[in-house]
Amino acid sequence: MMPANEDKENNIVYTGNESSGINFPQTPAHLLKRSHSNILKPPVRLDQLKRDANSNNGNTLKYIQGGKEVSPTKRLHTHAQQQGRLPLAAKDNNRSKSFIFPETSNQSKDADLPQLQNTLSIRKNDQLRKLSQISRSRSRANHNDLLSNSRKLQKYGSVLGYNALPKMKSLVLKDLADSGKNEESSDDDEGNEDSESKLGKKLQSALLKQDSSDGENELNGGLGLFNEQGGLQQLIKNSTKNEQKTKNDKSDKTDDYDIEIAPQRQEPLPYVPEGYSPFQQDDIEKLKTFNSPYKLDLEDEDDTPDKVDLLPLEQIDEEGEKDETECITRNQEEGAALPLLSKNFKEVAAVPTMELVYSEEGLDPEELEDLVT
């Protein structure tokens, strides 16, 4: 079985007031926020209201919660803030505030309905009066503008009822049935006839021709597209005639076709990069037969060495070079220079002589030990 406060959709019922019989589902407090189980506090009931004897002779009521007086609006505001989220039954904009005192709120609404209707009707009547006044003022302004402006009077005078205004020329064409009457009236108005005689005659002649052509078409048996002489049938006849003419022209002019010939395709030019001058065939042959000025023709006809401009080679004796090197080394050994001593030394110390020439013999083991140590 499910615990008592677990079915939050149906079983949990919130009663806003003891006197009111309205119930609606409410989510339990411990399911809204698990960390704080006592967030939703029950609303203040009538038995929790206490009278304040110090103000207004004890007639006012105040909310007393935790030993402090709290106003009803502040109580509702804090209650809505602490709620966290709206209950599941209040998701359709049914706030919990409206269910605290439902009877009093409904009664006040029912009592205020006629007053609201009266105020709305008064506002509508005021708006209609303002609109009518604005429209009247605008019509009067337009009327005054027409009277002050001569052009507007000439255009719209007959509409406004001013029949004494000068008549304007109309672009509407007169009927042909009244042609006789127009001719009789034209005898009276000779001045106007001079200006409009040419154009009127042209229009009348064109309309008479059109009427005569319509009468002939009726006699021939058809009007418009279904006429035998000038309609769909005539178009069909003309198209067949044109097709026959084109066939005859093709048969006569079979040899006169303009044959289109494409131009001969040219070979593409070779690719030449920028800054590169290609060698011609003459240049290549010159390079093949080029004679350098440093080239020597040693093979002459006379085979004489006088013509060759070269220095003769000197022959060097290797034995003589060896003798010279030996003499130089001996002189160096004999004429070894004495070391320069300062003037303070009276006794000349014996300076050991060193062999300058390597005798091609390595060091003894004793000498090697001396070097290492």
UniProtKB/Swiss-Prot annotation:
Composition-biased stretches, type Basic and acidic residues, lie in 1-10, 240-256
What is the native source organism of this protein?
Saccharomyces cerevisiae (strain ATCC 204508 / S288c)
| Residues covered by region (Disordered) | 1-27, 177-278
Report motif location: D-box.
85-88
Q: Phosphoserine occurs at which residues?
A: 185-186, 212-213, 277, 292
Q: What is this protein called?
A: Securin
Please give the subunit comment from the record.
Answer: Interacts with the caspase-like ESP1, and prevents its protease activity probably by covering its active site. Interacts with CDC20.
**Effect of mutating residue 277 to A:** Affects phosphorylation and the interaction with ESP1
